[in-house]
A protein has these predicted regions:
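Short, charged amphipathic alpha-helical segments flanked by flexible coils
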Residues: 205-212
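Catalytic metal-binding acidic patch
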Residues: 39-41, 45-74, 89-94
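Conserved functional hotspot residues or short segments at active or partner-binding sites
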Residues: 188-191, 206
Length: 212
């Protein structure tokens, strides 16, 4: 396996310690079902800071067994309990490698850790064209092969179609159910994300909120 551990995947020593511990524990549970571990999101595309979520992708040979899910639930509980603030800000999904490779297989449920959570749930949150593009083009390897070897190229127009659909779907959700978004945090969050999506749509590839 290439690059078992990248020694300094981020500029934050405490976060690097959390990530090393996390990957070691996951590998111990998955054994030969482990393919690789990667950072995506702001730690991949840039403009991260001390308040950023830590978005990860774990790639596996095949769907998780019941026993593996049980073991990983324990791992996430243990990592969340680490006395380092970064440990409570992990977010990501477990992708079977053939699902990750083909963007046509987007939208299905994966085992997912929500930001601030300590347990996995089924969710399609990360199973998108955008996440695949970021992993392929900018993914930060924590362990495993280079991410470009795991994801097929994604046409620019496919990416633009995804961005347009996200803008429309999210806009409809906000207008249909505005109450959860009627606060200072979400209003700023929405503006930043729409600026980013418009910027990405113009350029044809994803960037950071700051760039948007």
């Amino acid at each position: 396996m290439e690059n078992r551990h990248k020694p300094f995947p981020t500029p934050y020593p405490d976060l690097n310690r959390v990530l090393r511990d996390f990957v070691d524990r996951v590998q111990a549970v998955l054994s030969t079902n482990f393919v690789g571990a990667y950072l995506q999101g702001s730690f991949a595309v840039g403009d991260f800071d001390l308040h950023s979520d830590v978005d990860f992708i774990l790639v596996i040979e095949e769907e998780l067994s019941h026993e593996e899910v049980h073991g990983l639930q324990a791992v996430h509980e243990q990592i969340y309990g680490v006395d380092i603030p970064w440990a409570q800000h992990l977010e990501g999904s477990y992708f079977p490698k053939e699902v990750l490779r083909d963007h046509a297989r987007r939208g299905g449920l994966l085992w997912y850790l929500d930001h601030g959570s300590r347990s996995l749930i089924p969710s399609a949150h990360c199973n998108t064209v955008l996440v695949r593009w970021v992993i392929r083009e900018h993914g930060v390897t924590l362990a495993g092969p280079a991410p470009a070897r795991l994801v097929d190229p994604i046409p620019v127009e496919t990416l633009r179609e995804h961005i347009r659909a996200t803008m429309q779907d999210w806009g409809q959700e906000i207008l249909s159910h505005p109450d959860p978004f009627n606060n200072r945090f979400y209003q700023g969050f929405i503006v930043l994300n729409y600026c980013r999506m418009l910027h990405d749509l113009h350029r044809g590839f994803p960037g950071s909120k700051l760039a948007g």
